[in-house]
Amino acid sequence: MASRAKPKPPPVDPESLLRATKEPDFRQERSRRSYLALIEAATLLFSSHGYDAVGTPEIAQRAGVSVGTFYRYFDDKHEVYLEICRRNMIAAYRETIEGLGPERFAGRARHETIRETIAVLFEHVLQNPQLSRSFTEMSLRDPQVAELRRAFEAVSTQRLTLLISAIVPRDVVPDPEATAYVIYGSAMQCAYGLAGHVGAPPIDAARAKTALADFIERALFPIR
């Protein structure tokens, strides 16, 4: 008799996935400090040496706590890596896209809004290029990291789609969702290129920021 196929689990909401932090509900400030010290230590080590070369003893030593303390909060280094990845993506979303409302694109303000948002995005990626490169590499071989990256892309694109729909007439941008996807992809790929993910970039960050901002502004607000 053939066995029944297991039902697929319901899809996880991308925003819920990104915000599903593993941080415990601390009752003592000392415990909270130890937890955050482990996060910081792991971030530094993964940035410097990559995922494979780092072990839990090194993370605990760098954080100034025992290995037993590490396992009090995390099952293994993979779990702390996922938490770092999640925190980084949430921070990027909050610092760039989450606060963008239609009112910030009224008249000449849109010019500065676009440039400021690009500057913040580039700063976020370039302040720790090794870590962002690690996230990219891991997303190609780790399903959970890939899932987080897809969730970040989905949430960002959804937000941009709503924004474009609100500020740009449909006769100018007939497909807000596709346009949002292209703008998101262009901005992220440009930032990753400047971070050296595929070698030294051929142009500097200032020129790239200006060109990307002009490209986005022309796409959304063409001179008619």
Predicted regions, residues:
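N-terminal intrinsically disordered/low-complexity leader segments
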Residues: 1-33, 171, 224
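Hydrophobic alpha-helical bundle segments that form small-molecule/ligand-binding pockets
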Residues: 102-107, 127, 142-143, 153-180, ...
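Short, basic, alpha-helical segments at the C-terminal edge of helix-turn-helix-like DNA-binding modules
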Residues: 86-92
